[in-house]
Amino acid sequence: MVKTASGDIRNILATVNGLSSSFKGRCNIVINDREMYVVIRNLLLLWVFSVFPPTEAAEMGLHLWYSAKLPSAMCKRLRESFSEGFKKISLHMAKAPSTPSDTLLSTSFNLGEKGKMHCVLPRAHWTELFSMLDLKMSSQEATQIRHQITMNEARRDYRERHLCLIPASCRASKQQFYEDGLLLPFGADRSEFTEANL
């Protein structure tokens, strides 16, 4: 299967999860996108879904994909997992610091007992990935940046028109999402979500 412009990887996940447990064949999936941050996000999500136990991976992936903040413990585990998993490519880049940014660098990861992910990205993508993992932005800083977009007074009409089009019962939760960016049920405890998302 080839999935170009793979901005949304849900179809890929549904296809792979839909394979029968008795499937013994080989399944090659090629995904790409021209947007660097989409590629990085998809790589991190595929890593999470492959490395962590299914229930934990589902929650981690959901918040990594959609929430503006993460619980401190989750953020720590993700950073450690990504750093360990991508150590080989990081060491390779450190040995050749003058390599041009458009040079393709590849690495492979084992995904459980049967799977393998082969990742080929320009050096610039890897550099950005590592800088994102090293970024230490405060929760307040992240909220301020997010509010400049989601709560911007110039966008008020857009927000209010959107709220008018959704059922009244959904408006308070949508407004809450505009404000805090957490994909949680309305009224759920948000106190653990203290770290800016990667």
Language-model segments: residues:
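Class I S-adenosyl-L-methionine-dependent methyltransferase module
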Residues: 20-198
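Conserved class I S-adenosyl-L-methionine
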Residues: 1-16, 26-32
